[in-house]
Amino acid sequence: MRGAGGAAFGDGVSAVRFCAVSAGEGRDDDDDGMARRLTLLVTSWDGTARRYACRAREIGDVKSLNSIDLGAPALCGTFVGTDEDAACVGCLDGSVRFVDFKTGAFRVVGAHDDGAVSAVEYDDATKKLFTFGWDRTIRAWDLTKDERGRAVSTTKTAGKCYAADLRDGKIFVATSDGQVLAYETRDLVRGVDGDDGRRASEAPPRPLINRRSSMRFQTRAIAANIRGDGFVAASVEGRVAVEFIRDEENDKRKYAFKCHRKTDDASVGEIVYPVHAVAFHPVHGTFATGGGDGYVNFWDGDAKKRLFQSPRYPTSISALAFSPCGSLLAIASSYAHEERENNKPEDRVFLRETRAEEVTPKSAKTS
């Protein structure tokens, strides 16, 4: 394990994200992606968006490329497609900012009306940026248009958007009222009026999913699986749910399990930690969870088995991200105030080189 550049953060780390890689881009001779140069985006409550460069075969050689002060706590971020110089960040003040790492400048794309931006996702299919806010809206932005403050579409949700993920043209959203929603991205921007930025049709887009979460407590993180037929959601109650889009399949196959808990003999019994992060391995389809207990667990969702538990990190795991080939896992170790603050460790980002036994499904190991 290595810290990303050894850099200290002035406040908690909110998100980590690798830049996507175009087909054939940066591949080495044996085509395993291990020598490929990777770019990592890190956002922080200290108001910075930072960029790092690394390689799996040279995991100790992590280079800090640049850091941009946004002037507001940054809660989430994503690269714009495969452009490692362009990123978008959502902030606590509701603003959505486009960051140009090449020039070191940023501009405000727009803003949500009330409250923070909890997630930002760029969709290659529609070439739109989707943002999710505490103002109970999902907004789509056209980054090619210099129309500040004007979203090309706005979709209302019943609850605040607390967590979201996008994969292969599907958006998954967990809201404050305990609902889970899913949409096709093309449906969210279909029929928009490009002149005034409002939806041309009054009929709201029809969701793929609009159902009650199977977990009793607040959803903290959500991630779409790599097959595109379901998702994993994690809650503040140390529990993870595996669910599917189609109602018939979901009724048969959905399940939930407890994790990130420990028994404390000196107290009343079990201590339950929130699960702050979920990330799917891009090749094998297994997934990792990060909790307030400081551990990263690797899971085979189909076999319903834990594959591996990492050594304990200095403090809570606030964010996770696999590299495009799955050779690296970025791990944000950042205190999330689950317990009384006492000698709080330094907020850091670690890079872990994944091993086959940690991420390979059990069915593949035995075949």
Task: List the model feature ranges, each with a label.
Residues 1-367:
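WD40-repeat beta-propeller superdomains and closely related acidic/aromatic-rich repeat-like regions
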